[in-house]
Amino acid sequence: MLGAIHLGVLAACFVLFVPMAMAGWHLSRNKMLFFSGALFISLAVCVHLTPYFPSVSDIVASVSSVVVYDHRISCINEVNQIVWDVKPVPNPESVRRNNGSTKLDYFVKNWDWMKSRKVLSCEFQKLDKFDVSDLLNGSWVVVAGDSQARFVALSLLNLVLGSDSKAMDSVRGDLFRRHSDYSIVVKEIGMKLDFVWAPYEKDLDDLVVSYKKMKKYPDVVIMGTGLWHMLHVNNASDFGFRLRQLSSHVESLVPLTPKEQEGGGSVSGRSVHLFWIGMPVLINGMLNTDEKKEKMSDTVWHEYDRSLGESKILRQMGGPLILLDIQSFTWNCGPQCTLDGMHYDSAVYDAAVHVMLNALLIESHQSL
């Protein structure tokens, strides 16, 4: 293509300047005729060169697509930028009269996205039940991991079904059966949600490989581990190694382009949206066993956090999964948002779900 352009330009120069020079020699006394001839030849050259150059509409489309792509990346990077407003309830006496109340009930927890120019340009929003129903209509959602993942699944179902609905009463009981999987189909919108108890990275790895073998892929996968490994293995280097293994399998979870299968046929390219549930801030003095206080110290926590970053499993580090920044949320919500220094108020996981949904809107090029 480049050689054709060079050849065309060379020919154009010959066609343009040789006749102009000849015309100038013979018509130097008639400047009007000279310039008319020059203009005619120039227009003819432009007509002949036009096929070798992209159209203006192509250039504009190319530039606009780059701008949209850059804006999308910028908004994904900003989606976790939320701030918290945690205040004591105005009437603590009413909380005291409630027999089932805990320390968490004495504080009102509100959150929203930061009001910086970058964040405002992304137009993030808290979605209601109807918005989420439209977004996840007909989707297969998988939430896999430890207890943090279970709380994320609960918050998502709260939003889809309505926290006050009768369906949520049974969901809470079934979802929190100790160390078990859970599955539900929301018939009204055709959404299926699977919670997979997978407290170790190897469990997540096996899950991802199973989807690859079956050639059946969820639309959304939300996963996260770390706490069990920290408590029961207590080796940050091994944690990082396991995450790198997981990352390599997640990257090949689905074909990016149609590929031929063995025995004929093709696998159509499709998009699986992948999210990682970050580890919460651990408040050591509030942990409920001596073993946890010893093995899950601040030093160990930071080693695990560093291994997570170095594993390159996260999108911000060049990996496949978008971070749901539970670390930031729990740090900013503070000790008023936890009873045991590890598991936090539902508001934290609600925020994570809204962050995930806004990222999903960006990734799937949708708007509400």
UniProtKB/Swiss-Prot annotation:
Coiled coil: none annotated. One of its GO terms (molecular function) is xylan O-acetyltransferase activity. Disruption phenotype: Severe growth defects and collapsed xylem. Decreased xyloglucan acetylation and decreased O-acetylation of xylan. It is a single-pass membrane protein. The chain crosses the membrane at residues 33-53. Residues 1-32 are cytoplasmic. Its main location: Golgi. GO terms for cellular component: Golgi apparatus; Golgi lumen; Golgi membrane. GO terms for biological process: xylan biosynthetic process. It is found in: Golgi apparatus membrane. Residues 54-368 are lumenal. Keywords: Glycoprotein, Golgi apparatus, Membrane, Transmembrane, Transmembrane helix. Glycans are attached at residues 99, 137, 235. Component of the plant cell wall polysaccharide acetylation pathway. Does not directly catalyze O-acetylation of xyloglucan but exhibits weak acetylesterase activity in vitro. This is Protein ALTERED XYLOGLUCAN 9. The gene is AXY9.
